[in-house]
Amino acid sequence: MSGLSHHHKSRLFLTVLEAANVWLATLSPITRKNYASGIKFLVANHILDGSMKLEGLVCCDHCDILNRIKSLTFTYSGKPVSEASKQARAACYISFTKFLYRLTKGVIKHASPSKDFGNPTFYKIRDKVKTEFISKREWLLFFDALKKISFRDYLIGKLIIQGVRKLTEVISLRTEDISFAKNQVTFKVKKRQNRYQEVKVSYPNFLMQELQDYLGNREGWVFVSGEGQQVAINQVYYYFKLAEGDINSPIKVTPHVLRASALAYLKKMGFADQEIMRVSCLSSTQMLSAYDTGMTDNLTSQLPLIF
């Protein structure tokens, strides 16, 4: 460590929470919210000491910390900790240490997940996604209610479900991403290592006409607030909740639920996996199969009676 410049040494005198705040500020809104919750969890459960200087992590055994996270059964307040929660906190810690590795130019090493057979840090918890789906009838009722409340958020939801898109992709649209002549919208899909992939999605005439009516002659962000700024995620969730309440939906209707419902619907309708993967940007058939709502018959039901 003696070879470090003074600039890099000074970073080791940041506290864990100070460094975490710097890290969180570099993340996208949804990731920031999730990882802020993760850091708070790790500090509250004495996995991390928020007041400790970063120099205390130089000789830290990351494997021990990951094992402590994975060994939790209850929080300090007595709440049970699920496997999904433990894996999410472990992912948060690993990502945080990778940031510290970059921040300190390698002085603090980053944590790596264990792949030991029988005790891996990460493993598949369930075959099917936990998200509840809504039926076509339910989303038609939802959109009727949403259209009366907020035409902007109605259009956002329509682009999500018709194009199998994520909310962040839709609210990031700019007017130059839309070709009304081709009935086509170009989405920028974020991939790993801050790379972006452009995905062109064709929409039906009536939806493109509604979008054109909403835009008028405006340029810039497609979906804007009353002040003309890019619409915030929480605004969309607010109006979705109002529409959900109007139809007394037993299922919480969120942008994620709309996208998941679209994937489940396409699978149910028998569209080819490769086609669904191409438009949704899912990277494997295994990921797509998690949205398959079809019941698989037990093999024995297809055999002749033995007795």
Swiss-Prot record:
Positions of the Tyr recombinase domain: 129-304
- Residues in the signal sequence: none
Q: Which residues form the active site?
A: 188, 256, 259, 291
Q: Which UniProt keywords apply?
A: DNA integration, DNA recombination, DNA-binding, Plasmid, Viral genome integration, Virus entry into host cell
Question: What are the GO MF terms of this UniProt record?
Answer: DNA binding
Q: Does the keyword DNA-binding apply?
A: yes
Core-binding (CB) domain segment(s): 14-101
Q: Which CDD domains match?
A: DNA_BRE_C
Q: Name one GO biological process term.
A: symbiont entry into host cell
Against Gene3D superfamilies, the record matches this protein to:
Intergrase catalytic core
What family, per the record? Answer: Belongs to the 'phage' integrase family.
- What this protein is called in its record is Virulence plasmid integrase pGP7-D
